[in-house]
Design a protein with these regions (language model features):
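N-terminal active-site wall of soluble small-molecule enzyme domains
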Residues: 171-175, 189-195
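Substrate-binding cleft of carbohydrate-active enzyme catalytic domains
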Residues: 1-183
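Flexible, acidic glycine-rich loops studded with aromatic residues
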Residues: 185-190, 200
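Conserved alpha/beta catalytic core and glycan-binding cleft of carbohydrate-active enzymes
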Residues: 192-198, 204-205
Length: 205
């Protein structure tokens, strides 16, 4: 689980703001004595690629294969905090302190999103030799897409018919990119539509 709304934990060399901004959280939601509140103690940190390569080597010596997860298009607030233009609104936000599901996800109509995600996947593949790469796909509300000019335009151009199928299209773009590198994709079951590529492994939770 390299990334989530609450922090991006892998060094990404091509996009350094992922680490200087995306790995820093101003507080954390906690539950104590039955009460839920935000502890404003700052939290930050990420693994360098060298550290992760060392972890991979340590695991391989013990016959363990580490499968990295980079969740898209949801659970990306840390990435969006670093690069707000990747969201539908483009508004500046902060790394999420609370748990739960955010309405802000990556914009499916923005070509820059596809470029950035592919670049990040390239760096993940450079570090992790695993046959599989997990793309998450769960808990991605479509509210922002429904009101986004670029998303609606892409939906119309591709004649997909629904925003759920737009997510299927998005995942397929990244599956094809990873397939060129000899990698296979895993996604959470609720992020896969009936028309998803049969080569994608569905993980049920």
């Amino acid at each position: 689980h390299l990334s989530d709304d609450q922090g991006f934990r892998m060094e990404i060399k091509k996009y350094p703001l992922v680490n200087t901004i995306g790995s820093v959280r101003g507080g954390s939601e906690v539950v104590s004595d039955g009460k839920r509140y935000v502890d404003e103690t700052p939290h930050e940190g990420y693994f360098t690629q060298d550290e992760l390569c060392g972890l991979v080597a340590y695991a391989q010596e013990r016959h363990i294969d580490i499968v990295p997860e980079f969740d898209v298009p949801g659970h990306c607030i840390a990435l969006i905090a670093a690069y707000p233009e990747l969201s539908c609104s483009g508004k500046v936000t902060e790394v999420r302190k609370k748990w739960g599901i955010s309405k802000d996800i990556l914009c499916a109509g923005n070509d820059k999103v596809y470029e950035v995600v592919r670049d990040i996947l390239d760096e993940i593949c450079d570090v992790f030799p695993s046959e599989y790469i997990h793309l998450g796909g769960d808990e991605a509300p479509k509210e922002r897409w429904c009101n986004c000019k670029l998303c609606k335009q892409r939906l119309s151009e591709l004649k997909l018919g629904s925003f759920e199928k737009l997510q299927t299209y998005m995942v397929e773009c990244f599956r094809e990119h990873l397939a060129e590198k000899g990698r296979k994709v895993i996604c959470w079951n609720d992020g896969l539509g009936d028309d998803a590529n049969g080569e994608i492994v569905s993980q049920v939770w």
